[in-house]
Amino acid sequence: MARQFIYHMSGLNKAYGAKKVIENLHLSFYPDAKIGILGPNGAGKSTILKIMAGLDKDFTGEAWLADGATCGYLAQEPHLDPEKTVLGNVMEGVAKKTAILDRYNELMMNYSDETADEGAALQDLIDSQNLWDLDSQVEMAMEALRCPPADADVTTLSGGERRRVALCKLLLSKPDLLLLDEPTNHLDAETTAWLEKHLREYEGAVLLITHDRYFLDNVTGWILELDRGRGIPYEGNYSAYLEAKSKRMIQEGREDDSRQKALERERQWIAASPKARQSKSKARIKAYDQLVEAANNQRPGDAQILIPAGERLGQVVIEAEGLTKSFGDRMLIENLTFKLPPGGIVGVIGPNGAGKSTLFKMITGQEKPDSGSIRIGDTVHLGYVDQSRDHLDPNKNVWEEISGGNDIIKLGKFEMNSRAYCGAFNFKGGDQQAKVGNLSGGQRNRVHLAKMLQAGGNVLLLDEPTNDLDTETLAALEDALEKYAGCAVIISHDRMFLDRLATHILAFEGDSHVEWFEGNFEDYEADKVRRLGPESVNPKRVTYKPLTR
């Protein structure tokens, strides 16, 4: 018997004005498929999910969900009911299940022969769906996703906290088809690993957009690439996609050599042994002088991101000694000591609210430690790229916003054609004329990075630079940071990004303890299990030591 499909698309077309985003798409999805959607920012990835969720009906062709099937959608900016608490919003995901329990309890309170059959049927339903443990299931999901306190007012939550509440509500509802737009944004590594396992074992179909390449590798069995309006399916996970894509590009002979090499580098990295990855990160520190020399001889190219490094660093870069910092009645950082060597790249990890941004503010001098010290070397010139996009002018086009209207951009001691510089951030041809106000979240992030990285500096502070980036720009940014002749301190939840780049990890582990570790993220995780046991990698709500005065 042929397998049934849970969703069908036939001759699907979608355009924004004169720009065709999706062209004559024909796809059908199996009810247990796990599919990752890839493509440049603005290629229509989020649009596909909105059409499938029934939120975008302005298209031609056909798109429909199988009869009787249910669909759930996580948007990049999800809506929560402002009149309800965190728990009230989460419980919306199990409203039908609580109604079953409420009806059963009502029947048992007023038991009669007339309702005996209904009560027995409800008991069978409760048994089959394991609803007796519903409260503990909700509590476990909120714990795993590190949701804010149950009684918290959702109108006071950050964007990341709102997304975790919405994701928790969606997963508890258990729809037949899950549509997830950047589900790992604002999730720490432990929560991301939990979500990976949950989705791998999920009984329904999953379509997801994510820039987390390990997540794609560990969850998906298919990759759908959106390429200039077409949808190209690849069977296999992200590693298999890289190999198949590389072969396809060679056959078509249509891509430039730099893109081909970038794909091959990424494929080799995923295939490399942990020992080989570790030796690469250690080699960076030893080769700082060679990095500086190479940077002096480097010339900007059309297909690469170049980060101007500034002057050579002395032996003192950033040093902390007994650093302690509180916020209100919570101790965020207690007795932290570390020394960043020239050439080092530090990955800063931990849950939202743990104190990562506070650490950045102490490095930049915006905040002072309660006790201890933080020393910035005399040769250090800081460059700071935060998460804010508020400074972007929605009325300017991409080229104007990035270049300031100048034909030449100065990158340290080099000069580069401004349109070529925009192209390095994957804005090519007519894309440079697009209005900033009409861009997707990922495209706005690329504009923001392109503007902020021009200034350079020999120590970069990067706050979640990979959020919403397409995989092409992400790989280009990694290549630029690998060649960067300076230090970087990077807040990120992207494990592959941290594995490829980090020479050290600063991990906010809870109870105000921050662990300084030499090695990349993979090494750190192994060390954490050795120190704290296997349970240490399971997500829990962030905890702080109470502040005593």
Give the residues covered by each predicted segment.
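ABC ATP-binding cassette signature C-motif
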Residues: M1-D257, G301, I307-R549
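Intracellular alpha-helical coupling/juxtamembrane segments of multi-pass membrane proteins
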Residues: A244-R277, S281-A287, L291-Q298
